[in-house]
Regions:
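Short, low-complexity, Pro/Ser/Thr/Gly-rich segments in the mature regions of secreted, periplasmic
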Residues: 161-176
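Short, hydrophobic/aromatic-rich segments at coil-to-beta transitions
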Residues: 33, 156-158
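Generic detection of short hydrophobic beta-strand segments and adjacent strand-loop junctions
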Residues: 49-51, 112, 172-176
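N-terminal export/targeting and maturation segments
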Residues: 1-81
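A generic structural motif
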Residues: 39-40, 160-162
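Predominantly extracellular/secreted and cell-surface proteins with exposed
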Residues: 70-122
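Structural signature of eukaryotic scaffold interfaces centered on beta-propeller domains
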Residues: 24-28, 40, 94-97, 149-151
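Acidic, glycine-rich flexible loop segments
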Residues: 112-155, 163-166
């Protein structure tokens, strides 16, 4: 177990290999403002997507999602995305689509819509539809084999979350 800010953050598992799956990467402890996180091989550095709230506790309506790194492969420190990562790789765009509802898109994969809205529990969640199944998204794993920084060879994307109607954990994998 790895402590960060006096909290256990994740349980370390086996290192990434060519047969890596989402379950071989560390699962993060719950965090009240985190919407979901992304992990990808070849290392355990994790991209965090969390609610962007002001000191008054209100959601920033212009930029409702804050994205940053937890650099586990280094010292486990929090680090902001750099300009290239934010604008071309891991950043998101947000557009209001209703009261307390936002269309969220990855800058690197705009054709996959995500929705930020309040769930039945009254809290904000990111919802995604994969293979005709809606889920409240909790984590994404991206399997990369070769390619370049600008054009990685993505073998698959695996998403985990919960079914909003049953509360059961679901997992879906697709090839982008």
């Amino acid at each position: 177990l790895i402590p960060v800010n006096n909290k256990t953050v994740f349980q370390k598992k086996t290192p990434a290999t060519s047969t890596t799956t989402i379950d071989e990467y560390p699962a993060l402890a719950d965090n009240i403002s985190r919407l979901f996180y992304v992990q990808r091989n070849p290392n355990s550095n994790t991209i965090i997507y969390e609610l962007n709230v002001g000191k008054d506790g209100q959601l920033d309506k212009d930029e409702p999602v804050h994205v940053y790194w937890i650099r586990y492969a280094e010292k486990g420190q929090k680090e902001e995305l750099n300009y290239i990562q934010r604008k071309f790789a891991y950043g998101v765009t947000a557009k209001a689509s209703g009261r307390d509802k936002y269309d969220i898109r990855f800058v690197s994969y705009k054709k996959f819509p995500l929705t930020l809205m309040k769930g039945e529990d009254g809290k904000y969640h990111i919802f995604a539809t994969v293979n005709q199944k809606e889920m409240a998204l909790s984590r994404i794993f991206i399997k990369i084999e070769g390619g370049t920084f600008w054009l990685p060879n993505v073998k698959y994307v695996e998403m985990k979350g919960t079914d909003p109607s049953t509360g059961k954990e679901i997992s879906e994998r697709f090839k982008p």
